[in-house]
A protein has these predicted regions:
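A short glycine/serine-rich beta->alpha loop
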Residues: 137-143
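Catalytic and GAP-homology cores of small GTPase regulators
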Residues: 1-132, 139, 148, 159-227
């Protein structure tokens, strides 16, 4: 009847309005991170009544909005502020890594944003990834630190094998030695580390091509800085 048609029309137009607002927010965010987030607050998409609410809404925006600038997402997630760190937590928690190989999980995670260039930002991002992966696969690792150091080791391997600025690469024996030195423990198959090595050797993790990220990944080779 007429009332149903009116309700349908209003619903469709409300959806169109929301879509337009999100498109506008994406454009503003891509131009300037702060302005984009302020706009999202102005249209009621971000509830900033508490830190947790605000962080959850920003994480949802990052995960569910198409055509966002990946460099800006990575830059925000890497910042050393309460809001960025809490957003990174909920951003990582939005992934489901249960029963997924850790290399595949890293591929999924790193496709959604551009790794920032600063080492400390990179550390925080890998830490939150590994924490989520550990929580989703608690029987695989003996502790959360093992998940973190293995994740870091994989990124080192990626850099050593596929960054043209690294001349000598890394052998399986060298990779395994790094992991043993970091006392990585878990319920692993005998060929677990060699399988990871071969995956990265044959099919590198796809990373956005930005010189700043390349330089940051090169710094990972200085493992002693992490310890």
């Amino acid at each position: 009847d007429y009332a149903d048609k009116v309700n349908l029309y209003m619903k469709e137009n409300t959806n169109l309005k929301k879509k337009y607002e999100l498109q506008t927010a994406a454009t503003k965010f891509n131009e300037n991170i702060k302005n984009g987030l302020l706009y999202l607050k102005s249209i009621g998409y971000i509830n900033d009544s508490t830190l947790v609410n605000e962080a959850k809404d920003i994480a949802s925006f990052f995960r569910n909005t198409p055509n966002l600038k990946k460099q800006n997402i990575g830059e925000f997630l890497g910042e050393n502020t309460d809001l960025s760190i809490t957003t990174l937590k909920y951003f990582a928690e939005s992934f489901d890594f249960k029963n997924i190989d850790i290399v595949q999980a890293l591929r999924m995670f790193l496709l959604t944003f551009l790794l920032p260039g600063e080492g400390q930002k990179l550390d925080r991002i890998i830490e939150h990834f590994s924490s989520k992966y550990y929580n989703d696969n608690p029987t695989l690792f003996a502790n959360a630190d093992s998940a973190f150091y293995l994740s870091y080791g994989i990124m080192i391997l990626q850099t050593a094998l596929h960054n043209p600025n690294v001349k000598d690469g890394m052998s399986l024996e060298e990779f395994s030695k790094i992991l043993v030195e970091q006392n990585i423990q878990g319920n692993f198959k005998d060929d677990y580390f060699s399988d990871i090595y071969n995956q990265i050797l044959e099919d590198p993790i796809s990373l956005p091509e930005l010189e700043e990220s390349k330089q940051s990944l090169l710094k990972l080779l200085r493992w002693e800085d992490l310890c």
